Each structure stands twice: as structure tokens, then as C-alpha cells.
Amino acid sequence: HGYGLTAIMGLTLSQVEALMVGTKTWIANLNAETQIVIAGADEEMAEVAKRALAKGASKAPRLAVSVPSHCELLAKPAQTLVEAFSRVTLSRPRYAYLSGSTGRVLWQPERIADDLAMNMARTVRWQEAVISANEREARLAIEMPPGGVLTCLTRQAAWEGESISLDRSGIDVAVHLAQRLRA
């Protein structure tokens, strides 16, 4: 308790980083050019949010999560997953694995295992990942439940395809779009 995430909207990464100086907060998500999510203790995030609003951020809400995801505060549990993956045999994937923390496709099983295990302790580069998927001509993004935030963020990131939330659109719409795009 006492930890989580705060979204800073309306400021760039460099502006948010400058506001974080002297606090124990971390960049958690790079969702869009001017939507940066920070992680940390509630008081520290509140201070950064206050500074952000004073510098012209349009919003700086504390998100409804109690985990400081995608930052070094979760390095220890991530390391536990690294150790678990060391006991699993992985093969090269048949389909491209797009990393949210690098925004790049990974093919090597050991790099994919590291990415999956360490994801909770690394910054998510959502916008870069969406751009990378777009460059590879992916044309359908389906957000799994719950929610629809990623669907909206995908549309904002120069996405040229369809983007839907299963929560909001349902499986029938997803199947229809997949079939239409395959034809």
C-alpha cells in the first residue's frame, strides 16, 4: 500500500524527468509524446503531479492501481521470474514477439524470456511498440479485458490499422475484423 502510478498529460518526457529530480519516482510508461506515467510512493508522485500541473500539464491523475509497475521497485520479484525462466526450455517463436519495453521485435528465446520476466521492472515504451507493429504492417490490435485504455493509446500512436477493446466491442466484432483483414 502507498505505491502506484500517476499519469502526467500535456508534458514531454524531458519535462517530466526534470520535475522528478529529487524524488523517488520512475518513468513507468511512455504512452504517447505527451502522456507519461510515473511510478513510486503516493507522496512522491503527488509532489511530481503538483509540479507538473504548475508547469502546464493538462492533467496528472493518480491511477487506480496499487502497484508501482514498470520500475526498479519491482526488480526483486522480476528476478524471481528470471530464475523461474532459467528452468524452462523455450523455442524460437513462429510469430514475431514485440517487446513493450524495447518497442522492438525479439526472436531469441533467451531475450524473450528476459523481456517477459523483467517487464514489471522496466519502462513500457507503448508508443514505440505500436509504431514498430505498424511498420511491420500489423493491421489489427485487440486489447484483452479489462478496459480500453490501450485501444485509445494505440489509435493515438500513428496506428494505420483497426484497434478494438474486447471489453467494449466483443468477440464477434474482433472475429469479423480479423476475417475482413485476412481477405
Predicted regions and their residues:
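Alpha/beta catalytic cores of group-transfer enzymes, especially the acyltransferase/condensing modules
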Residues: H1-R122
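Acyltransferase/transacylase module recognition
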Residues: R87-A183
